[in-house]
């Protein structure tokens, strides 16, 4: 099983505690995602002007990009309360009914990992989203009866990293759909500088930029790296973070300038050295790395593919010339035609 990686985009308990102190409260402080910010500002102002609950919002994108943070910002801008839960926590229809009936008019209900709602719970959610009503079964057996409960107008914000797993009926009930994109190094630099100021960390612009460029386009990773570099600077550099200190800390953490850690590099090196650059089937690769297939597909591969170091083909995984150069190796001459073309899956 893979241990927690410093560059993992999934949240940890430390991340949750630290993020609460640096989380922006207003859209003006929410850095990056400019198209999303501009659209949400219009939707929020329009809903407030009409005195209505804002339409339901679906936010999707890779983990660590600020979906939960954006939900807090939306509730703050609307001037209403936010109730936070997640799909796996809502096990029964009664759990959802309890949440919905305790909402005040125009409140925001945030459901993280909404793709993990059970079908039974989803059925209760449909009329709640459309008509602000829920049907509850009272009693058992022949004496059971259904009663309708009216709900106050509310805004549901659903967040997911797996939008493709949402059922069509649920997806169609969201009037506003927003996709969060990876951040540019410049945007992440601004985020690191802002976080450092809030946390009282002495960090130069060059030091912040060095942290940002290795953060894989993800604010959660940038803030986590900032905390680890702060630890290094506190012991080795009197608490001051500049470019050399940031670079030395990253070398200690084994995070290279591309944002890769040892597991990323090991995967690329394995494909090059053991499988002649590929293509190699994912099961063979997982066995060679002593990792689970799911870890490769969901944790390691996405960023390597996004950055152009790895490609998926019908015949398996292949590294690109960019990967050879990153490993300090000479790329092979152009492969024979047909390599990487659709063919045998095994």
Swiss-Prot record:
Amino acids binding DNA: 293, 312, 317
Region (Large ATPase domain (RuvB-L)) location: 1-183
Assigned keywords, A-Z: ATP-binding, Cytoplasm, DNA damage, DNA recombination, DNA repair, DNA-binding, Hydrolase, Nucleotide-binding
Subcellular location: Cytoplasm
Region annotation Small ATPAse domain (RuvB-S): where it falls in the sequence: 184-254
Residues that hold ATP according to the record: 22-23, 64, 67-69, 130-132, 173, 183, 220
Enzyme Commission number(s): 3.6.4.-
Amino acids binding Mg(2+): 68
Reactions listed under catalytic activity: ATP + H2O = ADP + phosphate + H(+)
Pfam family, one: RuvB_C
Single GO cellular component term: cytoplasm
One GO MF term: ATP binding
GO biological process: DNA recombination; DNA repair
SMART domains in UniProt: AAA
HAMAP family: DNA_HJ_migration_RuvB
Function field: The RuvA-RuvB-RuvC complex processes Holliday junction (HJ) DNA during genetic recombination and DNA repair, while the RuvA-RuvB complex plays an important role in the rescue of blocked DNA replication forks via replication fork reversal (RFR). RuvA specifically binds to HJ cruciform DNA, conferring on it an open structure. The RuvB hexamer acts as an ATP-dependent pump, pulling dsDNA into and through the RuvAB complex. RuvB forms 2 homohexamers on either side of HJ DNA bound by 1 or 2 RuvA tetramers; 4 subunits per hexamer contact DNA at a time.
Domain note: Has 3 domains, the large (RuvB-L) and small ATPase (RuvB-S) domains and the C-terminal head (RuvB-H) domain. The head domain binds DNA, while the ATPase domains jointly bind ATP, ADP or are empty depending on the state of the subunit in the translocation cycle. During a single DNA translocation step the structure of each domain remains the same, but their relative positions change.
NCBIfam families hit by this protein: PRK00080.1, ruvB
Family to which this protein belongs: Belongs to the RuvB family.
Name recorded for this polypeptide: Holliday junction branch migration complex subunit RuvB
UniProt source species: Xanthomonas axonopodis pv. citri (strain 306)
Taxonomic classification: Bacteria, Pseudomonadati, Pseudomonadota, Gammaproteobacteria, Lysobacterales
